[in-house]
């Protein structure tokens, strides 16, 4: 067989022309230190701040400190298998979490991985955990109410969709209960809820999940948990993962309620990471950017313009105080970022006033414009009346010689305090709140003994459900009070029918 040199030459030339180099160039570094959820690596000269980095054992970290000699990395997950000398490589990506409808009803960690034992989550969508907040022109003013189902909040410190309302108080004052009741009340309201548990005991998170499941609220809720036993980087990243999941729904035109329980523990985790990364400590050893830690998170909650779908994220961040000190560093930071605060007092809680809301220290800066007309009419003077009662009550400690007007104010105040009490996990629809507050402010409860107020309230709802459900329906559909004469007649008919009199 003759060998044709020209054919061989042409074949080799063609193969050289068609040759595609098949290799991957990745910038790598070497781990020089590992411990306490922190790694330092040398050789990653082009790493970006916030970039996701991969260790050779498959663990991931996030670049935080970009220094001249090395990169400070927080490790997202278990770091026990990482050793000094291990290779770490750049991914060219920033951290993302899975998002979408598939997450609803599930309990996940801050990386979006399921921890409820119900199998994998099938979702194709991802969002970066850190994204810019909507700009000024991308927002709308808060105009729609978010009903929590709690009379003390919906009447005194109303919340609107797109608002950030801080819940602040000592431990064991009912902060989580307020948020869980608000989530329960969103059933049938076309709201998606996200509960972010930061640094909580796993048994506590389990209890909250079971409560949500028992009342059917898990059908529209995502639970993101970074428990107390997990490394600080996961506690730090958990709120950002939660709001990234919320943003996916907001930009689809949906409404989301997100609860951060609580941001005090996130600040402590961030302080720990910052000190381990050798960042300069400031007041109370927190780093200088601890304000930015929370502001960039809470600014992502907004009511966006119609061009962006008209959706909203309403945030209820928690801050735990020590001995009721709301002037502490982290507390004042978050108060200045949010649109108001609900202050829960330990002495009110211990005296049986639950929810233990201190009306004098609580405020909603933008929620009033979202309150429905009916509630505005019946609760307009309630806050001032309550504050006046507290003041008079303090003065009566010094003597019992009171004129009739003062005695009447005290009697009305005691009934107001009783009416604003509410059992756990029993949120009320707004129409029932309006009717009982109307009865209170128009003097129908003045002759009812204080001890019978709660029984009177329950009986009134039952009576209206049977005989005057049309009044409830009017409030529900028109968002306004029905004819006062009709409401007066209905309440008088109930009082004649019942025996709640002194």
UniProtKB/Swiss-Prot annotation:
It is found in: Cell membrane. It catalyses: ATP + H2O + 4 H(+)(in) = ADP + phosphate + 5 H(+)(out). The record marks 362 as: Required for activity. Keywords: ATP synthesis, ATP-binding, Cell membrane, CF(1), Hydrogen ion transport, Ion transport, Membrane, Nucleotide-binding, Translocase, Transport. InterPro entries: ATP_synth_asu-like_sf, ATP_synth_asu_C, ATP_synth_asu_C_sf, ATP_synth_F1_a_nt-bd_dom, ATP_synth_F1_asu, ATPase_F1/V1/A1_a/bsu_N, ATPase_F1/V1/A1_a/bsu_N_sf, ATPase_F1/V1/A1_a/bsu_nucl-bd. One of its GO terms (molecular function) is ATP binding. It is a peripheral membrane protein. SUPFAM superfamilies: C-terminal domain of alpha and beta subunits of F1 ATP synthase, N-terminal domain of alpha and beta subunits of F1 ATP synthase, P-loop containing nucleoside triphosphate hydrolases. Produces ATP from ADP in the presence of a proton gradient across the membrane. The alpha chain is a regulatory subunit. This is ATP synthase subunit alpha. It comes from Streptococcus pyogenes serotype M1.
């Amino acid at each position: 067989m003759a060998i044709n040199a020209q054919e061989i030459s042409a074949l080799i030339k063609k193969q050289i022309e068609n040759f595609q180099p098949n290799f991957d160039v990745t910038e790598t570094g070497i781990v020089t230190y590992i411990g306490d959820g922190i790694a330092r690596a040398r050789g990653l000269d082009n790493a970006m701040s916030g970039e996701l980095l991969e260790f050779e054992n498959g663990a991931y970290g996030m670049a935080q400190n970009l220094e001249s000699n090395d990169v400070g990395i927080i490790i997202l997950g278990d770091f026990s298998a990482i050793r000094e000398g291990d290779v770490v490589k750049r991914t060219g990506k920033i951290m993302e979490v899975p998002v979408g409808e598939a997450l609803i009803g599930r309990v996940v960690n801050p990386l979006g991985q399921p921890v409820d034992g119900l199998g994998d989550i099938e979702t194709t969508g991802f969002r970066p955990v850190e994204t810019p907040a909507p700009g000024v022109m991308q927002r709308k003013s808060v105009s729609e109410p978010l009903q929590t189902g709690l009379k003390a909040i919906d009447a005194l410190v109303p919340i609107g969709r797109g608002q950030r309302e801080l819940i602040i108080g000592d431990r064991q004052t009912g902060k989580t209960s307020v948020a869980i009741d608000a989530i329960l009340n969103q059933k049938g309201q076309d709201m998606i809820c996200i509960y972010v548990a930061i640094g909580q005991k796993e048994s506590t998170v389990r209890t909250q999940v079971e409560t949500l499941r028992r009342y059917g609220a898990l059908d529209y809720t995502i639970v993101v948990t970074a428990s107390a036993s997990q490394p600080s980087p996961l506690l730090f990243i958990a709120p950002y993962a939660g709001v990234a999941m919320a943003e996916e729904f907001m930009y689809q035109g949906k409404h989301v309620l997100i609860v951060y329980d609580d941001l005090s523990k996130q600040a402590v985790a961030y302080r720990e990471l910052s000190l381990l990364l050798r960042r300069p400590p400031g007041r109370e050893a927190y780093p200088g950017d601890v304000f930015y830690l929370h502001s960039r998170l809470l600014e992502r909650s907004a009511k966006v313009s119609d061009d962006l779908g008209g959706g909203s994220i309403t945030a209820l961040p928690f801050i735990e105080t020590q001995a009721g000190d709301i002037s502490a560093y982290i507390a004042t930071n978050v108060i200045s970022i949010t649109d108001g605060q609900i202050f829960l007092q330990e002495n009110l809680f211990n005296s049986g006033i639950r929810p233990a809301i201190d009306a004098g220290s609580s405020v909603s800066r933008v929620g009033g414009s979202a309150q429905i007309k009916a509630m505005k009419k019946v609760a307009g003077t309630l806050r001032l009346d309550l504050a006046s009662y507290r003041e008079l009550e303090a003065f009566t400690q010094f003597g019992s010689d009171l004129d009739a007007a003062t005695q009447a104010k005290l009697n009305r105040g005691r009934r107001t305090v009783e009416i604003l009490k509410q059992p756990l996990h029993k949120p009320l629809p707004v129409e029932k709140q309006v009717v009982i507050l109307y009865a209170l402010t128009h003097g129908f409860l003045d002759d009812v003994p204080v001890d019978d107020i709660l029984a009177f309230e329950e009986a009134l709802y039952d009576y209206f459900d049977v005989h005057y459900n049309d009044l409830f329906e009017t409030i529900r559909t028109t968002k306004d009070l029905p004819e006062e004469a009709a409401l007066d007649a209905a309440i008088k008919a109930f009082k004649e029918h019942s025996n709640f009199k002194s």
